[in-house]
């Protein structure tokens, strides 16, 4: 099915949830909510506050697509974010005194206690957390009392308060207890957590006043999808009741419904119901939104419940179509011109993802009878699905949408559509078409490294070398994928910033409650929870303090925090961003498998950030995130007769099997690193299918940019850029690997079975 998958069936890297947004500009905030950032080991997870705006929040306030719940270990892939490094002057290594972190030490959470290990109380903490997730109030109450001296005692205390408040939301005593808790922990992340979950309880109880009071005080979580939907619902209810600002409230609600990545969330379902109650005539636009969001069951339910007068099509005919669109088309294919235009619009939207060619035939038939806006909406969707299927007709379909491509009323995914229009143009090899597509991008996307680079390439190919060089130069100081390619386009060396890492001020961070609570969570393998505390400590720090905290993370072997914390600065400290833990083991395994160690380092950095015990929700394990089934297959191939799944978290075993599998994948794709890297992430059969879709030999950079899975696209770009950095930064003979060389050219080859798991 041609869709941009967020879940990859073979071996997702810590549960892959992709963001349907393109790369942001060099130091714009990554497109992550704080919840997403917390749930992420590998992606840049913090907005960079400029040093002069010390209080900049982590979230940029935008409603995000596919927001992630704050519970559970998940992996989120944001856009590739490039860095404009600060000019570097050689400095002497010295201990840096960080600025005061925005945390409040409390008597209940002595920082040093975080490093104290007590297996019995740790086990009780985990069990209490599980009880909280199951809403077992009695077990949580008991756990909270017993864990009063645990380093993370404030969490069971909060869980207990939340369960009691959920049970009796109007109980004044429970409300006062929660208010007191929040006041006592003012300035700590736990207060943000308490306000967020209390706001959700208030929304569930339709307590608008309480919700707004809590929502206004949130620093991080205002952009969570359910809270955004609840706020829009309460604002709409006020407008309906007071008869004031109703058009504005309806417009805001429509925008939220259009942009939310969680239309199934209960809060967003309630908003949709409130919106339709306030404006029954909006039923048809909302129906079309649901069709584009592929919420076909919800669309069918809406059609069933809506007054027939609000739909421009017979509801029985609509039900027949939605129940079995393929059967419907076979019955009506020869008389499409006699079917109502609205019904054909729905038919094309319904079939676009599963049968794009048939959808295009229907769109062609009905186009003359549609308004310009509806015609644009339809062809935008057909073009998008064709582009995601790597169909060579995609660019022509997009062109049929006209000037309103991606922007017609009720069109879902404007930025996504416009970005894929540009990617479809890349696959045509028509550089004038590429330039035209890039020029249609919104300013923020146009300023991203990716589209600065491709615009420069287009200008270069169409006879404007001076303008092209100016654009290349504007990103050539960046250290990510397109910054490296821009350097090559200019014939200049890659950036080589040798700023030394600071000596960590351990005594300072040892007393920082948020940092120490994070360490306690990491000890319990509760990485998402630990990341929230870590990021909270980090959120207002300036560059030097962030680098010092990164050094502290490295000294604790928290390489995922060392990398991410250092990346949340404009100062490029290569030893922090590209560490080499387990050097002997990694290099031995790579060399035994006849792989370049730099590639293995680059892959592990993206897979697990060198977390030895990393485990995905579907079972991928260890630094190289190997699935047990794959591991058993490779072990049999290597005649490792004594292998067991439990060995996958053993560093040596994981590296041996992971490297051998990577070598087998590379050999299956004739040594092509883009194809092999994509295959390691998304599966060999998918990589082979993407290659088969090519109509001519394509440069590796174009192939990588047009991979239809957001996660895999970013993965390939990051892994290969990582490979260049590891090869360049640590290579004593300065024999620099060129990114363009390892990207190479990808040649089409008929689809074939790849005998690999």
Indicate residue ranges for each PLM-predicted region.
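Gram-negative bacterial Sec-dependent N-terminal signal peptides
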Residues: 2-27
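Compositionally biased, proline/threonine/alanine/serine-rich low-complexity intrinsically disordered stretches
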Residues: 28-117, 121, 749-757
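Generic helix N-cap/helix-start motif at coil->alpha-helix transitions
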Residues: 116-124, 136, 149-157, 172-174, ...
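Structural motif corresponding to the intra-repeat A-B loop/turn of tetratricopeptide repeats
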Residues: 134, 167, 201, 205, ...
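Alpha-helical repeat scaffolds
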Residues: 139-143, 171-184, 208-218, 242-258, ...
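Catalytic glycan-binding domains that act on GlcNAc-containing polysaccharides
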Residues: 150, 158, 361, 365-375, ...
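Alpha-helical adaptor scaffolds
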Residues: 161-166, 182-183, 195-204, 216, ...
């Amino acid at each position: 099915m041609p869709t941009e998958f967020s879940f990859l069936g073979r071996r997702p890297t810590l549960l892959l949830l992709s963001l349907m947004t393109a790369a942001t500009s060099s130091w714009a905030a990554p497109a992550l909510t704080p919840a997403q950032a917390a749930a992420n080991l590998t992606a840049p997870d913090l907005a960079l506050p400029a040093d002069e705006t010390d209080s900049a929040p982590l979230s940029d306030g935008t409603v995000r697509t596919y927001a992630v719940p704050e519970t559970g270990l998940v992996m989120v892939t944001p856009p590739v974010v490039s860095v404009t490094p600060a000019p570097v002057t050689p400095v002497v290594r010295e201990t840096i005194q960080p600025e005061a972190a925005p945390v409040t030490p409390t008597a209940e959470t002595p920082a040093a206690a975080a490093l104290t290990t007590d297996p019995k109380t740790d086990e009780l903490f985990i069990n209490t957390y599980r009880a909280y997730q199951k809403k077992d109030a009695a077990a949580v109450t008991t756990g909270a009392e017993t864990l009063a001296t645990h380093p993370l005692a404030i969490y069971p205390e909060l869980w207990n308060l939340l369960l009691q408040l959920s049970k009796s939301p109007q109980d004044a005593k429970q409300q006062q207890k929660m208010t007191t808790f929040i006041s006592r922990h003012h300035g700590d992340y736990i207060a943000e957590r308490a306000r967020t979950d209390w706001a959700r309880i208030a929304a569930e109880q339709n307590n608008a006043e309480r919700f707004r009071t809590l929502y206004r005080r949130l620093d991080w979580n205002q952009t969570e999808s359910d809270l955004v939907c609840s706020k829009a619902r309460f604002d709409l209810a006020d407008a309906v009741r007071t008869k004031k600002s109703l058009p504005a409230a309806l417009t805001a609600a429509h925008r939220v419904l259009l942009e939310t990545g969680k239309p199934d969330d209960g809060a967003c379902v309630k908003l949709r119901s409130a919106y339709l109650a306030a404006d029954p005539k909006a039923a048809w636009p909302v129906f079309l939104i649901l069709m584009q969001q592929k919420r076909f069951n919800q669309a069918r339910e809406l059609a069933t419940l809506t007054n027939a007068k609000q739909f421009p099509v017979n509801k029985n005919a609509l039900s027949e179509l939605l129940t079995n669109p393929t059967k419907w088309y076979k019955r009506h294919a020869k008389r499409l011109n006699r079917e109502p235009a609205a019904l054909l619009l729905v038919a094309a939207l319904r079939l676009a993802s599963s049968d794009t060619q048939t959808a295009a035939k229907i769109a062609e038939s009905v186009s003359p009878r549609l308004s310009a806006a509806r015609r644009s909406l339809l062809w935008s969707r057909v073009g998008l699905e064709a582009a995601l299927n790597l169909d060579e007709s995609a660019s022509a379909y997009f062109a049929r949408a006209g000037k309103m491509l991606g922007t017609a009323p009720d069109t879902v995914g404007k930025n996504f559509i416009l970005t894929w229009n540009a990617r479809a143009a890349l696959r045509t090899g028509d550089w004038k078409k590429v330039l035209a597509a890039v020029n249609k991008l919104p300013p923020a996307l146009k300023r991203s490294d990716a589209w600065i680079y491709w615009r420069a390439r287009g200008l270069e190919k169409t006879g404007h070398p001076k303008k092209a060089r100016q654009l290349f130069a504007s990103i050539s100081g960046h250290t990510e994928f397109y910054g490296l390619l821009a350097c090559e386009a200019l014939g200049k060396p890659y950036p080589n910033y040798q700023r030394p890492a600071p000596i960590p001020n351990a005594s300072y961070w040892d007393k920082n409650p948020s940092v120490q609570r994070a360490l306690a969570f990491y000890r319990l393998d509760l990485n998402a929870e630990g990341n929230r505390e870590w990021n909270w400590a980090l959120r207002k720090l300036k560059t030097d303090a962030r680098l010092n905290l990164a050094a502290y993370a490295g000294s604790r072997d928290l390489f995922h925090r060392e990398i991410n914390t250092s990346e949340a600065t404009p100062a490029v400290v290569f030893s922090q961003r590209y560490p080499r833990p387990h050097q002997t083991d990694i290099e031995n395994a790579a060399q035994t498998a006849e792989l370049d160690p730099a590639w293995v380092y680059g892959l592990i950095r993206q897979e697990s950030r060198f977390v030895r015990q990393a485990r995905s929700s579907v079972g991928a394990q260890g630094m190289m995130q190997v699935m047990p089934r794959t591991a058993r297959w490779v072990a049999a191939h290597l005649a490792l007769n004594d292998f067991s799944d439990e060995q996958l978290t053993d560093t040596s075993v994981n590296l041996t099997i992971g490297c051998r599998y990577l070598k087998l994948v590379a050999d299956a794709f004739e040594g092509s690193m883009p194809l092999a890297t994509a295959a390691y992430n998304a599966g060999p059969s998918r990589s082979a299918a993407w290659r088969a879709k090519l109509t001519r030999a394509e440069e590796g950079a174009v192939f990588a940019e047009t991979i239809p899975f957001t996660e895999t696209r970013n993965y390939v770009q990051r892994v290969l850029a990582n490979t260049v950095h590891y090869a360049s930064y640590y290579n004593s003979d300065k024999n620099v690997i060129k990114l363009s060389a390892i990207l190479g050219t990808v040649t089409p080859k008929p689809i074939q079975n790849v005998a690999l798991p």
